[in-house]
UniProtKB/Swiss-Prot annotation:
Keyword rRNA-binding annotated: no
GO BP annotations, alphabetical order: photosynthesis
Role noted for this protein: Functions as an electron carrier between membrane-bound cytochrome b6-f and photosystem I in oxygenic photosynthesis.
SUPFAM superfamilies: Cytochrome c
Gene source species: Pyropia tenera
Gene3D superfamilies given in the database record: Cytochrome c-like domain
Family, similarity comment: Belongs to the cytochrome c family. PetJ subfamily.
Any single Pfam family the record assigns to this protein: Cytochrome_CBB3
Name of the protein described by the UniProt record: Cytochrome c6
Binding site for heme c: 14, 17-18, 58
Coiled-coil boundaries: none
GO cellular-component term (any): chloroplast thylakoid lumen
Length: 85
């Protein structure tokens, strides 16, 4: 995974709602490690699936972003969650 690319993809596409690992729309659904674990969103596959398909207020990015960029962003999110954002 390319974490530098993941950070760029995240900044351009995700940070509007998820800056600093937070969630501007649904404040309890953050990208913090404990919340990701509690919602079974602490794997690359889980994050990639949700980014591609969307859920509730989150739009689908499949078709807007290539799979490699989504995977890099997912790796970046997990990396940042391990560091506590």
């Amino acid at each position: 995974a390319d974490l530098d690319n993941g950070e760029k993809v995240f900044s351009a596409n995700c940070a509007a709602c998820h800056a600093g690992g937070n969630n501007a729309i649904m404040p309890d659904k953050t990208l913090k490690k404990d919340v990701l674990e509690a919602n079974s969103m602490n794997t690359i596959d889980a994050i990639t699936y949700q980014v591609q398909n969307g859920k509730n207020a989150m739009p689908a990015f499949g078709g807007r972003l290539v799979d490699e960029d989504i995977e890099d962003a997912a790796n970046y999110v997990l990396s940042q969650s391990e560091k506590g954002w």
